Amino acid sequence: MASVSEHCLNEIKPTILKCDKNKDRQYSIDEIVQLLKKNSKNPERLAVLLFKSLNKKLDESICFNDIDDREISKNCDKFQDKPEIDIESFLLRFDKNNDKMISHHELKTKLDELGCGNSKKTTDYVFEQIDTNKEGSLSYEDLEGFVKFLKQDNNKKTSLPSV
């Protein structure tokens, strides 16, 4: 039986290879997200998993010249349950100007797109709870701190209030 990561790789590899317009076999994480948006439920999360498993040089792009499916599968499994994957995919989904921060406007706009009826109240609440330094934007560190807080208090039921 195939692992989750093998299934993910089998799902996305043909699409990515087929969409290489200039045939240089180099992709940024944003390009991968765009490619996956058509056929994936959570393209940001899949892109982060793929990027982390392939980007050995830790630069701004990944290369498909030396793909080793078994190594990718092993690496994806290693990252699969790490909270930073979800944090990074959350940032990719909501950070429209690619500054690695989520502004009040970016969050509200995305919530409006998703059909949230009370996006202003929800956005205000999220920022009140997570923006600890009150900069007016959510950073990776803010989100990471919130995830750690939730993990510490995992016996309590924590959820956003209905607004």
From Swiss-Prot:
Listed PROSITE patterns: EF_HAND_1 (PS00018), EF_HAND_2 (PS50222)
Family annotation (Pfam families): EF-hand_7
Binding-site residues, Ca(2+) 2: D131, N133, E135, S137, D142
TM segment ranges: none
Disulfide links within the chain: none
Swiss-Prot/TrEMBL keywords: Calcium, Metal-binding, Repeat
GO molecular function list: calcium ion binding
Limits of the EF-hand domain: 20-42, 82-117, 118-153
Gene3D superfamilies named in the record: EF-hand
Keyword Cytoplasm on entry: no
Record keyword Lipid metabolism present: no
Binding site for Ca(2+) 1: D95, N97, D99, M101, E106
Note: Does not bind calcium in vitro.
The protein, known as: Calcium-binding protein I
